[in-house]
């Protein structure tokens, strides 16, 4: 079984500084062949690029996204824009295959909705200009996120395959709108929780060729590791639960979601 974890924050040194090599060995033993390093800030993005280079011989393949999370939108200034452009101009040699994670988040008040929207729209423009998918974060901001994405879609400034809504927690109705615009949906540990309500119905509805698996490590570890630090090896539990919901084998789900990730992020990833 070969699994592609499409969202992991292994660049957070405080979380993995003592055992990153063990974490990667665990991932390899669990069947994880590829990890997408998620980024939230300019500093975070730089560390992702460093980790990819430093751990290239680990037996697990890495790809990177670069971008500024909505919680850091107040720091999305001219310097941040310049740095993203510099990286994106050299995306192939740096292993950058997406812009992210970007989006809207009203759960905390780190940045105003106006700042978040500005950073989101600008970075969606970068994704379009550099022909890369966007990795989109949405929390407690579904209406405004959909408004922005629909506006970009109607203006024809979204790629044909525009990206993925990572850690998707929306309704079936919202999922259908996103699927109609060409998006993929990413799922992680919460689908294994007993109180999972929306996700099972969304997964059952979603076409197999639009599903992705992720961990969002170090957050949201799946059952049976809920409450502990998450790591890419645990993505197998997400695969198993998605397979159960779609009534196929875990091996088939791993194969399909890996092929989906490679189709979205590039066949060479």
State each model region's role.
Residues 1-269:
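Mid-domain alpha/beta scaffold segments of enzyme catalytic cores
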């Amino acid at each position: 079984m070969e699994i592609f974890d499409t969202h992991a924050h292994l660049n957070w040194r405080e979380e993995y500084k003592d055992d990153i090599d063990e974490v990667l060995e665990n991932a390899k033993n669990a069947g994880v062949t590829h990890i997408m390093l998620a980024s939230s800030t300019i500093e975070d993005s730089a560390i992702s690029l460093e980790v990819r280079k430093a751990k290239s011989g680990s037996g697990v393949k890495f790809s990177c996204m670069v971008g500024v999370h909505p919680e850091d939108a107040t720091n999305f200034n001219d310097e941040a824009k310049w740095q993203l452009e510099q990286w994106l101009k050299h995306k192939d040699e740096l292993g950058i295959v997406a812009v992210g994670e970007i989006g809207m988040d009203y759960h905390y008040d780190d940045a105003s909705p106006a700042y978040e929207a500005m950073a989101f729209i600008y970075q969606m423009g970068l994704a379009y200009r550099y022909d890369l998918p966007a990795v989109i974060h949405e929390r407690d901001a579904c209406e405004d996120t959909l408004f922005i994405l629909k506006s970009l879609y109607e203006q024809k400034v979204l790629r044909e395959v525009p990206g993925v809504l990572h850690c998707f927690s929306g309704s079936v109705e919202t999922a259908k709108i996103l699927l109609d615009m060409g998006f993929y949906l990413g799922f992680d540990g919460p689908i294994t929780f007993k109180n999972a309500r929306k996700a099972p119905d969304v997964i059952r509805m979603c076409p197999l060729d639009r599903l992705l698996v992720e961990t969002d490590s170090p957050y949201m570890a799946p059952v049976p590791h809920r409450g502990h630090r998450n790591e890419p090896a645990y993505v197998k539990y997400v695969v198993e639960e998605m397979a159960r919901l779609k009534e196929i084998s875990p091996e088939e789900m791993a194969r399909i979601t890996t092929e989906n990730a490679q189709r979205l992020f590039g066949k060479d990833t």
